[in-house]
């Protein structure tokens, strides 16, 4: 999909013609790996995975607007840009920063709703994977929030400080993060 980038007219166009193939199918695959808490919950687990895939991908788009444009890609829906007064995205144009901030905050709210949907059905997943999925929702949800509340616009690539990442884990799991770095 990135080999021949094209603009996406609406959020629905973006989700169905890009996000589905880049993130949602990964969530579906992982749902088969992780499993559901019971066979009857598998559909809910798939719905949660779909919501999480969309939320994660939207957050990544919001974080990387300037970098994506440098690579010839624009993942912000064209209709939202036009509604904010941007006819053609130019991430370097200081005159567009306010309008881009409006679009970013709007899409961040959309992503926030998808994170909430993913969290609502977290119990549909097998118990042994819920902690990892919950941590993912919380860390990326925090990144999404930082992007939405940033006064620096797209000139700064937001991230979540390590302390905030640790805060979403139970203390009994802290040792796993340094171990992951040591075993690379």
List each language-model region with its residue ranges.
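Catalytic cores of Mg2+-dependent Asp-rich isoprenoid enzymes
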Residues: 1-55, 62, 67-184
């Amino acid at each position: 999909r990135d080999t021949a980038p094209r603009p996406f007219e609406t959020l629905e166009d973006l989700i169905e013609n890009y996000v589905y193939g880049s993130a949602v199918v990964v969530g579906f695959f992982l749902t088969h790996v992780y499993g559901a808490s019971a066979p009857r919950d598998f559909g809910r687990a798939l719905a949660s995975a779909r919501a999480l895939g969309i939320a994660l991908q939207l957050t990544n788009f919001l974080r990387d607007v300037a970098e994506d444009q440098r690579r010839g890609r624009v993942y912000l829906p064209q209709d939202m840009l036009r509604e904010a007064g941007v006819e053609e995205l130019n991430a370097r144009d200081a005159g567009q920063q306010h309008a881009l901030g409006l679009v970013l905050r709007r899409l961040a709210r959309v992503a926030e709703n998808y994170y909430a949907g993913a969290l609502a059905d977290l119990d549909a997943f097998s118990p042994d994977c819920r902690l990892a999925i919950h941590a993912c929702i919380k860390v990326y949800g925090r990144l999404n929030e930082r992007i939405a509340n940033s006064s620096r616009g797209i000139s700064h690539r937001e991230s979540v400080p390590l302390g905030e990442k640790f805060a979403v884990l139970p203390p009994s799991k802290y040792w796993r993060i340094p171990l992951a770095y040591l075993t690379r």
